[in-house]
Curated annotation (Swiss-Prot):
Gene Ontology MF terms in the entry: toxin activity
Residue numbers bearing the Phenylalanine amide modification: F36
Marked site (Important for antibacterial activity, and hemolysis activity) residue numbers: W29
Post-translational modification: IsCTf is an enzymatic proteolytic cleavage product of IsCT by the proteases present in the venom.
UniProt-recorded name of the protein: Cytotoxic linear peptide IsCT
Family: Belongs to the non-disulfide-bridged peptide (NDBP) superfamily. Short antimicrobial peptide (group 4) family.
Effect in UniProt of substituting G31P: Similar or 2-fold increase in antibacterial activity against both Gram-positive and Gram-negative bacteria, and complete loss of hemolysis activity
Annotated signal sequence range: 1-23
Impact noted for substituting W29L: Drastic reduction in antibacterial activity against both Gram-positive and Gram-negative bacteria, and big loss of hemolysis activity
């Protein structure tokens, strides 16, 4: 009975690993397809708005408080 339970647990863990890796690999593949798709490279201009190179005084004060 203990052996059967151990085999069941190992099988469940392996099944979970397979199911989760399949989902992760699927999302990675969708990202690659959208990046190199017909309009994928022209849509990268929207990413420029996400990066703000300037750090405000409030951000610096917050970082100083964090480092204390």
């Amino acid at each position: 009975m203990k052996t059967q339970f151990a085999i069941l647990l190992v099988a469940l863990v392996l099944f979970q690993m397979f199911a989760q890796s399949d989902a992760i690999l699927g999302k990675i593949w969708e990202g690659i397809k959208s990046l190199f798709g017909k309009r994928g490279l022209s849509d990268l201009d929207g990413l420029d708005e996400l990066f703000d190179g300037e750090i405000s005084k409030a951000d610096r004060d917050f970082l100083r408080e964090l480092m204390r």
